Every structure is written in C-alpha cells, then in structure tokens.
C-alpha cells in the first residue's frame, strides 16, 4: 500500500510538471483523473501514509483565520528603477568604475507579487509575502495551492528562495469571465487578481484561480558563483524559472534585449512591466553591496507607461509635512492602466513652467512607475487662448509667504506652525510604518487639531479619554479604543519613533540602522555627523539632516516631552556588543550543517557581531564551512581566508 501511494504521488507530480511547467502533457486529463482518484481513495483509507509532496495537498480548501506576520531571515530589497537608456548607462558607469570586467544578466520583470519560500530538509515550511522587505505575511497554505510551487525538493536541503507569484493571462481571462457571469466585479488587471487571490482566506479559491510562479533568487547563502548558476540550480531543484533571459557583455547588449522583449511583450503568456539587469558575478554583487533601499548591483528598467489624453479642469495646491507645496491637476476622467484617473500630479512650479502647462490644456497623462498618475506634456494642437497658470504666492493653508529657493524646484512654506504641515506630520507619526496608532487617521487628526487638543506629536500622549469624548462621533468605546492604541504605541522600538518624527531624508530603513548602532535616541541626538555618515548605506545627506534636526531647541524639547510621557526611546531589537567575538567581521556560511539549521547558524553569527554574506569576496574575513562546501570553500582557500567548521561555531 505504501509503495503504491508513493508511486502514484511520483507519477502524478511528474504529470503535473509536464502540464503546468513544460506545457507538454504526456497523458490525457481522463487518465490523470483516474490515477488521482485512486490516490485520494488510498489516502482516505490510510491517512497515516499521506506524503508531504502529495498533489492532494493542493486541492480542497480550508478557511484561514487570517495571516500572521513573518519576519524574513534574509531581507527583501526593492530595486532602483530606470526609465531610459541614459539611466541604464549611468548604472553601468557606476558599476564599471569599480569593476570594469563586470557582465550582466537580463531577466524579465514579472508583474506579480514578490514571494519568499523557505524549505527545511527539502520540505516547504514557510511561504511569505515581501511586505516591507523585513516583515511580510505568512501565506504558506495559499502558496501550497499554487500548482507549480514544489511542496518537497529532490534534495533534503535547507534553502530560502525568492520569486514572483503571478496570474497568467489565460487564467485572468477565465477568472474574469466567471466573475462576469456571476455578476461580480471583474479584476482590473492580472497583478490585482494575483494579489486578491493570495489574500484569500479560503484556500480552495486559491487552488481554482490558476496562479503560477517564477523563482529567480537564492536568498540563503549560495554555492553558486553567478546569477546564471543560481537559475540553473533552482531549475535542478524543481522550481519554475523564466528561461527568457540573456547574458550581456555590455549595456548595448542589454538594450538590444530590452528592445526585442518590448516587441514580443504582448505575445507573452504573462504580464511583464520591464527588464531587470543584474551584475552576473555574485562576488562582484557582494563587493558592490547595498544602499539603504536597494542593491547597487541591479536596476529595473521599466517599460514606458500607457498614455492617455485628458483635459485639465482646475489645479489644487496642497502643503505636505515638509512644507513643499504640490500642484495637482483635476482632469476629465480617463481609463489608464485599468483604473479611472481624474487627478494627476504636476510635480512642482518649475515643471509647470518648463512644460508651459495651463488650465484648459489637453495633456498627456501616464502613471509614473505604473502607480502615480502624472502629467507628461501638453498636446499643443489643442491649445486655445488659455492664460499662463497663476502660481500662488501665499501658502494655501496658513497664508504665509511662499519661498522658491534657487536650489529647489518646489515652492515651500517655511512657517513652523502651518496647520497643514502640522497635521501631515501628525498623520505620518501615527501611520503604520511609524508609531502605528490604529484609528488615528487624517479625519481624526483634523478634528483633534481643530479642537486645539494637539499641535505636535508629543501632544498625542497628553490626550485623555475625556478629551476624545469631546470630539464629534466619539463614544465611550471608540474613545477608549483610540486611547489604548496611543498607550500601546509608547512601547514601540525606537526606530518607529525616529521614522515617525519625519526628519528629512531619514526613512524607515535608515531609522533602523541608526538606532541599532546608537542604541537610543538620546545618544543619537548627540552623535557626531561623521560617525553617522560612516554607517553603511547612509552618508552625508542623512547625517547632516539628523544633526541639524537634533541641534534645534525644538527637537530637544520634543524628546524631553516624549520621555516624560514614557514613550520608549530605546532600540528593542538585538544589540550586538562591540566586543563580541565576531564584531565587524564579514562571514560566509557554506556547505551542509549536521547539527544546526542554517537560519540558526546565521542568527548566531549575527548575534556574535558578524555580517553574514552570501558569497566569498575580498571583504570576507571568515568562512564557516560544513560538509560538501564546494566552490565557495575552494575560493576562500585560494584567497587565504580563514576557515572554521560547525563545531567551532557551536563552541562560541
């Protein structure tokens, strides 16, 4: 019985691979169904014999309560975008300045959702969304219902891989036809359909929707020496990789590939929105490293966005939290990239002057980065006798004089008590990526500000339930709920607070780097500018912005008030002692470990102060090698790098 079940699982998985991955089915649907029903009957009679890679795991559904947060062991970085050949050439120049011998690999940019798959001993244990790159959502049960995601691998390896989950065009058309017949709203585009499907709490729906994947990265330390070898390894392990890639000796080669793919784009069975260009050599990737947000060794070329004509009906001017005054055009509605667009950014006053944009003009509208509607240019042939657009001289919020500095393209309100700026700062402070105060959105901020209850972020922590009950729409329950959310936010780790302060140029990733290094905001407030600038991924711009902010009397007063309100100013993550055994060292983990899981070994190395890298380079200080270490160990030996084993790591 056990042998027959094993045979059926093996045969059915092979047939599924032929159908879903190779598009070369060797048996009829009827023959597959007969074998599948036999397997179901055997598993029903003998549930103790069900194998982890049985295809029956992919069908049927169960209702999930929700999705738990999942902290990625290996962060997922976003990519720097490029929209022209000139920007690609600038990327190439930056790479070749340090590595003139570098070559590239060009891969299609699939228009789907980034996912991470983690296997232990060859079994799928976690499937997660990208989230913010550090924390995503655990959607393992849903990803198990995606037909081409391997439930087990042919080798009992520990590995984390990255890729894209998408909805093929054929599946999209089928699903939308079904929704239309059922009287349900159709999905706007395949990407939205894939996103909605992966967020389903009913796993049975996921199984029916026909999602697919392309995997392209080994996130855990790799034995490969190039990105092309990574793709070959993923292929060998049973993952679906996209074979529409090319190796390029120069940026000219990459541009040739981009042009050829652009011509074939509509004929592909899936949506793409560009081409990703990566340095192929993993050692060079390691040397180039990362900025705060993105790798220096890759760039995502985005295809030109869809464009439509629309008329500018009027222009609104709004003030953001940094005082920048932004013009937004109100448009005659147009359908653009699957959505109705009636507003589009005009960027700034210099852009309006450069393009000579006027109210009443017919303009070309597109979605910048396929996300933000923007005005590209005026259609001159429709120009009538419109007047030059009036530019405001006073802030639309506080009526203060606006400034237009020579080195800036935007108008700016410099009034420190401008209501719009203050409210925007409060909204940002309460936002999910900052202090995450649930329920404190723009409408509530406006009410609090209008009632004179808050003027800066410290005032939020002075609010009482009675204060909230004075606001329109608040009852005892809602007031207590918001009050508790405010109190809960006091215990956030300090990087949330630092990001929430809205210091110019200091984003969420930079905030974490800073508080990890300095431990708390009071220490950071007195840090030397050069000490800040020297941190990996930061630099002088962020350092100057921070030191200028904390040097102000207002910032010192704000910190004092937050401390008095018992808001946590300390980093609550793992802090590494500067005297730790591996402090400041770059360590590569390679080979098969006998007693520790790879993520446990990585966590221990980091706790000891090490920066764990994915491949050996000149910057590597130490290699911890298990069995079957392969080429990584060989390269380390050639470079004279110190080698240690698992027993040594355990002894620390």
From Swiss-Prot:
Active site: 109
Binding, NAD(+): 29-33, 78-79, 107, 130, 164, 278, 302
Cofactor: Mg(2+); Mn(2+)
PROSITE patterns: BRCT, DNA_LIGASE_N1, DNA_LIGASE_N2
Enzyme Commission number(s): 6.5.1.2
Catalytic activity: NAD(+) + (deoxyribonucleotide)n-3'-hydroxyl + 5'-phospho-(deoxyribonucleotide)m = (deoxyribonucleotide)n+m + AMP + beta-nicotinamide D-nucleotide
Keywords: DNA damage, DNA repair, DNA replication, Ligase, Magnesium, Manganese, Metal-binding, NAD, Zinc
GO CC annotations, alphabetized: cytosol
GO biological process: DNA repair; DNA replication
A GO molecular function held by the record: metal ion binding
Keyword Oxidoreductase: no
Keyword Methyltransferase in record: no
A Pfam family hit: DNA_ligase_aden
Residues that coordinate or bind Zn(2+): 395, 398, 413, 418
Domain annotation BRCT: ranges: 577-652
Record HAMAP family: DNA_ligase_A
Function: DNA ligase that catalyzes the formation of phosphodiester linkages between 5'-phosphoryl and 3'-hydroxyl groups in double-stranded DNA using NAD as a coenzyme and as the energy source for the reaction. It is essential for DNA replication and repair of damaged DNA.
Annotated family: Belongs to the NAD-dependent DNA ligase family. LigA subfamily.
Protein name, per record: DNA ligase
């Amino acid at each position: 019985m056990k042998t027959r079940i094993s045979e059926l699982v093996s045969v059915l998985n092979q047939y599924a691979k032929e159908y879903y991955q190779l598009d070369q089915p060797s048996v009829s649907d009827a023959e597959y169904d007969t074998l599948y029903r036999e397997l179901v009957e055997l598993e029903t009679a003998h549930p103790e014999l069900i194998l982890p890679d049985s295809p029956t795991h992919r069908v049927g559904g169960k209702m999930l309560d929700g999705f738990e947060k999942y902290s990625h062991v290996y962060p997922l970085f976003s990519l720097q975008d490029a929209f022209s050949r000139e920007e690609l050439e600038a990327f190439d120049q930056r790479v070749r300045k340090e590595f003139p011998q570098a070559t590239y690999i060009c891969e299609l940019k699939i228009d789907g959702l980034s996912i991470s798959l983690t296997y232990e001993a060859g079994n799928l244990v976690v499937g997660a969304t990208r989230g913010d790159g550090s924390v995503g959502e655990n959607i393992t049960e849903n990803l198990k219902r995606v037909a081409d995601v391997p439930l087990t691998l042919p080798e009992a390896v520990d590995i984390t891989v990255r890729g894209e989950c998408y909805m093929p065009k054929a599946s999209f058309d089928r699903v939308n036809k079904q929704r239309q017949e059922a009287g349900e709203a159709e999905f706007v585009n395949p990407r939205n359909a894939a996103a909605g499907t992966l967020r389903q709490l009913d796993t049975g729906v996921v199984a029916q929707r026909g999602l697919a994947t392309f995997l392209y990265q080994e996130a855990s330390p790799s034995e490969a020496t190039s990105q092309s070898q990574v793709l070959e390894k993923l292929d060998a392990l049973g993952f679906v990789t996209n074979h529409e890639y090319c190796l390029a000796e120069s940026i000219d080669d990459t541009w040739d590939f981009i042009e050829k793919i652009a011509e074939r784009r509509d004929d592909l069975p899936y949506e793409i929105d560009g081409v990703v260009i990566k340095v192929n050599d993993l050692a060079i990737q390691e040397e180039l490293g990362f900025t705060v947000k993105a790798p220096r060794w890759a760039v995502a070329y985005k295809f030109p966005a869809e464009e439509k004509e629309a008329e500018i009906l009027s222009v609104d001017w709004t003030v953001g939290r940094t005082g920048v005054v932004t013009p937004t055009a109100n448009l005659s509605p147009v359908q653009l990239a699957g959505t109705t667009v009636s507003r589009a950014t005009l960027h700034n006053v210099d852009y309006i002057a450069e393009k000579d944009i006027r109210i009443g003009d017919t303009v070309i509208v597109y979605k910048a980065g396929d996300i933000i509607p923007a005005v590209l240019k005026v259609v001159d042939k429709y120009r009538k006798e419109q007047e030059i657009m009036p530019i405001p001289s006073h802030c639309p919020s506080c009526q203060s004089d606006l400034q237009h500095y020579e080195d800036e393209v935007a108008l700016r309100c410099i009034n420190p008590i401008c209501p719009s700026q203050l409210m925007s700062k409060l909204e940002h402070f309460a936002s999910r990526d900052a202090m995450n105060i649930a329920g404190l959105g723009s409408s509530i901020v406006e009410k609090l500000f209008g009632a004179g209850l808050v003027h800066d972020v410290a005032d939020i922590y002075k609010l009482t339930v009675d204060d909230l009950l004075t606001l329109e729409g608040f009852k005892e329950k809602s007031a207590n709920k918001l009050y508790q959310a405010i109190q809960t936010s006091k215990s956030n780790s300090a990087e949330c607070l630092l990001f929430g302060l809205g210091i110019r140029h200091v984003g969420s990733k930079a905030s974490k780097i800073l508080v990890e290094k300095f431990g708390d905001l009071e220490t950071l407030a007195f840090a030397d500018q050069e000490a800040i600038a020297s941190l990996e991924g930061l630099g002088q711009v962020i350092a100057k912005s921070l030191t200028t902010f904390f040097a102000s009397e207002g910032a010192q007063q704000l910190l004092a008030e937050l401390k008095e309100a018992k808001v946590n100013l300390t980093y609550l993550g793992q802090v590494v002692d500067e005297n730790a055994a591996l402090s400041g060292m770059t360590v590569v983990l390679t080979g098969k470990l006998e007693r520790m899981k790879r993520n446990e070994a990585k966590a221990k190395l980091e706790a000891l102060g090490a920066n764990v890298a994915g491949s050996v380079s000149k910057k590597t200080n130490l290699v911890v090698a298990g069995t079957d270490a392969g080429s990584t160990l060989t390269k380390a030996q050639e470079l004279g790098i110190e080698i240690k084993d698992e027993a040594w790591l355990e002894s620390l």
